[in-house]
Amino acid sequence: MIFTKIDGNIKEREDLSHVHIETAMVKSDDLAKSILRVKSDHHNEYGIRLEEGKLENGSFFFIDDHNVLVLNVIPEKMIVITPKDMDDCGIIAHMLGNMHKPVKIKCGKISLLYDSVVAKNLEKSDIDFKVEEIQLEESLRYVDLS
């Protein structure tokens, strides 16, 4: 079966108690794709070829009137940086930009997938960071300056 349209997000729907849920585990990078093949926890394979919309953690697709496929993002090891001030933020942004790393910026924190080279550069530059397991809601993006 190939899905061409997202039917919703499981976090925004409360009326799915009457359906059986199959779950497919995906990497956060997969959320940026419009064409994807997944295998559910019931060992069923499904294709996704989106005509519009974007995948998110919790995106679901009706298989039929009684069954739903839900995408669940695998938690990933990530570097989380909390800049101390604007100068620190500028230095960090410059460093990560030079490394061409996609990031997530939210609530004053910069998050990116764990990379030992990045970690070593942050340590060398005396920049504090934490390594955490995080389940992303959407794929990381490169900063769009257009």
PLM regions with names:
Residues 38, 81, 110-113:
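Generic recognition of long tandem-repeat/solenoid scaffolds
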Residues 38, 71, 102-104:
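Short, exposed beta-strand/loop patches in secreted or surface proteins that constitute
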Residues 1-18, 111-146:
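Helix-rich terminal scaffold detector
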Residues 54-56, 61:
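Short, well-ordered loop/turn sites that connect or cap secondary structure elements
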Residues 87-129:
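Conserved, well-structured core segments that form or line functional sites
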Residues 1-52:
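Intrinsically disordered, low-complexity, positively charged segments
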Residues 70-83:
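Short glycine-/aliphatic-rich beta-strand segments at the starts of folded cytosolic domains
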